[in-house]
Amino acid sequence: MTDINFGNISRLEEFISRARRIAIVTHMKPDGDAMGSCIALYHCIGMYGSASAKIIINDRYPGYLDFLAAEVPDSDMIVHAQLPTEAETAIKDSDLVICLDFNAFHRADRLEAALTESKADKILIDHHLNPAREAFDLVFSETDISSASELLYHILMETVKIGHDASMLPPAAARALMTGMTTDTNNFANSTYPSTFRMASALLATGVDRDEILSRLYNQYGENRLRVLGHMMKDLLTITEDGVAYMVLDKATLRHYNVGEGDTEGFVNMPLSIAEVRMSFLIKEDDDRVRVSIRSKKGTSANTCARLYFNGGGHENAAGGKLNMPADITDITEAAGYIERTTHEFFTRNNEHKE
């Protein structure tokens, strides 16, 4: 991890100290890292005086994160999909906007216009490639780190209020940081660094109950999750000659199994356990587009593939994107052909085609 600029830490504390209303914003379809970092920052802002803070999210978080969200008053977490006017007004009325776990305003989807038009000071805390630096007054960007939650943790450790003492973190913030880091590393399975384990050790020393967090994250699913997983592995999983595994979930299947946000969490990683698979796709049909999750093994760039063919990007081995209809494909039935065609081209042009 690159050393954090101490001058920027001072500026961050100045921005927060003088703000009266703060909006904390993350990307669309917020995951554990997005919510963990936002909720942790929310709890820490109270250490800086009388500023009011609200978490503004584009759409609802997965149900397995309810235990974190329960520690934030309902009035301080606004979901645009449920209360669009209130969400946009909260951003407009804020004099400081802090964006976590995304690198450009368009990643906030329906909040993009409100963020672009906001006259507030804007701060970015993110671990993705190619941040839109020109859109922000202060940027903390680090890619050699596990998660936005870990980046936020190291920033907080450098502040005057925390002073390298994790026990000074509000307990709810410590739990949220551990949760965000755990989910983004797939429980320490990927994107882990020495700093990641130091963070985990320090948080455990403060009394964070990791066993409880793991139980909340991974042992609270509904039966439908296993049912749809079985269907996907038996009937939907396709593996190409290029070593690409993909599964396409259309709206009919999503409805049949009552698949909600978060119910397919982690599924895209599973085909990578197959020796000959080097890239895995999970395709989910939405109303006006197709959502794409991509994972890859070391030596194959999920990020490059997402940027070239799927209107997205992310990390080297974990990325996301979308297929627009009808611009990219006419309907979901064309998704399989699109994946096979584009990934074959991707591996061929990068001299990665399997012999």
Task: Show where each model-derived region lies.
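Hydrophobic helix-and-loop "lid/oligomerization" segment in the mid-to-C-terminal part
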Residues: T2-T26, G36-E71, S75-H80, T85-E88, ...
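Short, glycine/acidic-enriched loop or turn micro-motifs at the edges of active sites
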Residues: P30, F102-A104, L129, N187, ...
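Short glycine/serine/threonine-rich phosphate/pyrophosphate-binding segments
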Residues: G32-C38, F105-D109
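Glycine-rich, phosphate-binding/catalytic loops in enzymes
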Residues: L41-Y42, A114-E117, F140-S141, M199
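Generic beta-sheet signal
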Residues: I56-N58, L100, I125-H127, E142-T143
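Active-site cofactor/cluster-binding pocket
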Residues: I78-A135
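Conserved beta-strand scaffold positions in the cores of enzyme catalytic domains, especially
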Residues: K122-L124, V139-F140, V244-Y246
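Short alpha-helices
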Residues: H127-A200
